[in-house]
């Protein structure tokens, strides 16, 4: 009996394939994740408009330890770039200090800010948590970035 099998990578991170994206340009799963983040950011924008002055910054963490495809998809929520939306990727080269400076500038400009940060965004050792094997728990970056930016 002959059996032919085909494997199809499915990841929402859109990080499978060659660096030039000649073999795979979008993985199954990424499109629905991109749409989800677009909807989330639109909803957060409406909530952010109604926040009091003391809660004028909304920080969201998106999956993507080493690739910023999902945080980048949040821009789909605002094609005309009217929202005070900032996106920070693990591979973007920003520091926590530059993120805070950019947020402060946006607060001075528009009075509010929405920050979408990749879970792999480097916050240095700030609030770093490890699992039982000593691996970094990347989900913690949302809390540390949010705490650093809001405070």
Segments predicted by a language model, with ranges:
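Glycine-rich, charge-decorated loop segments at or immediately adjacent to ligand/cofactor-binding or catalytic sites
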Residues: 13-21
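Accessory alpha-helical/coil subdomains and C-terminal extensions
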Residues: 1-6, 23-151
């Amino acid at each position: 009996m002959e059996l032919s099998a085909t494997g199809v990578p499915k990841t929402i991170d859109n990080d499978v394939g060659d660096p030039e994206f000649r073999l795979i340009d979008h993985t199954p799963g990424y499109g629905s994740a991109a749409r989800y983040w677009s909807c989330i950011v639109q909803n957060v924008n409406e909530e952010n408009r109604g926040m009091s002055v003391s809660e004028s910054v909304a920080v969201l963490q998106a999956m993507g330890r080493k690739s910023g495809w999902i945080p980048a998809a949040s821009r789909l929520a605002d094609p005309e770039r009217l929202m005070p939306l900032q996106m920070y990727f693990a591979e973007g080269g920003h520091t926590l200090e530059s993120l805070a400076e950019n947020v402060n500038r946006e607060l001075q400009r528009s009075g509010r800010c929405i920050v979408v940060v990749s879970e792999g965004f480097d916050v240095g050792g700030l609030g770093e948590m490890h699992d039982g094997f000593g691996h970094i728990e990347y989900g913690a970056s949302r809390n540390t970035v949010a705490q650093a930016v809001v405070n």
